[in-house]
A protein has these predicted regions:
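C-terminal catalytic "cap/lid" subdomain
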Residues: 1-316
Length: 316
């Protein structure tokens, strides 16, 4: 097809886990529903790479690890838990894609890939944890958990309290060339889960995991840049980014320029930990080249957003 695009899709947490549905079977069902919403992109002939968040899952894995921590069965560090979440969620999405392809007669393959993202050891994020992971707590519960386990806790966009961990910016993705080759060949690749497993690289090129969780929207933006993708599609729980959110003059943003979006960011229109990183990630992708489009919308509006009739659309 003449208008075939390379699209990197960033899935929000709501695309994998709904409130009160945290079991494996429930999350696999949600993954299947999510894939069905993405299927029209693949049926249209686009090459698609999928990046997913892992905040709830990695936090729950950490809790499981701490619950069984003994001298004989020591708990795993945060970066290992991130790798476990990539394998787990990658399996759910890869299987859902396989089944959807089989059911719809689509001659495509899907694969999930453990992905490492290089970060900078001097990133100030290591001194200021901000990335929420794990379950929501009341303020009282959060302070108890913080005291008992040594966590840093913060309120998460008015939705409750959660543990927060360092969230350094991605510098590059180790497996990007392999992902690019697969995507170019028409394989639907699930990668860079949770923004990628954060690793440090020494002067000899050796890698070592570090305790952090990268924001998946920044990870998706970095992957999209390295793939030289046409479109970065950031999916969240709302149909579009909004200014004056919750006020009488609330307004959904449709077509917006880079300069306009930057001004809204500078004016404090977007909440940290919510819409702010999505808009910042969109701009970081657009800064990497011309002819690119970033879209922010809901999972349900995916097909309409790609067609240009829904969501917030920003072009370079």
């Amino acid at each position: 097809m003449d208008n075939k695009r390379t699209i990197v899709v960033a899935l929000g947490g709501n695309a994998l886990q709904k409130q009160g549905e945290a079991s494996s079977a429930q999350q696999q069902r949600v993954a299947g529903e999510t894939v069905r919403q993405l299927l029209p992109l693949i049926q249209a002939g686009h090459n698609v790479a999928i990046v997913h968040g892992n905040g709830p899952q990695v936090g729950n894995i950490v809790l499981h690890e701490e619950a069984i921590n003994t001298a004989d069965v020591p708990s795993l560090p945060l970066e290992d838990c991130g790798a476990m979440s990539q394998g787990l969620i990658g399996f759910w999405l890869q299987q859902a894609l396989h089944d959807a392809f089989a059911s719809n007669g689509i001659d495509r393959s899907a694969v999930s890939m453990i992905t490492q993202t290089i970060v900078d050891s001097s990133d100030p994020a290591f001194q200021n944890p901000t990335k929420p992971i794990g379950p929501f707590y009341s303020e009282e519960e959060a302070k108890t958990v913080a005291s008992e386990r040594g966590y840093t806790v913060k309120e998460d966009a008015g939705r409750g309290w959660r543990r927060v961990v360092p969230s350094p910016k991605p510098q590059t993705i180790v497996e990007a060339d392999v992902i690019k080759s697969l995507v170019s060949a028409g394989v639907t690749v699930v990668s860079t889960g949770g923004g990628g497993i954060p690793v440090l690289q020494d002067e000899a090129g050796q890698l070592k995991g570090v305790a952090a969780v990268i924001d998946k929207d920044f990870g998706a933006a970095k992957l999209a840049d390295l793939l030289d993708a046409d479109t970065l599609l950031i999916l969240t729980s709302v149909d579009a980014a909004k200014i004056n959110f919750g006020k009488p003059d609330e307004q959904s943003l449709e077509e917006v320029s880079v300069a306009e979006l930057q001004k809204h960011i500078d004016d404090g229109q977007f909440a940290a930990g919510s819409m702010l990183p999505k808009t910042q990630a969109a701009l970081s992708f657009l800064a990497g080249g011309t002819g690119r489009t970033a879209i922010i919308t809901s999972l349900e509006k995916t097909a309409e957003a790609i067609a240009g009739t829904a969501g917030t659309r920003i072009k370079s």
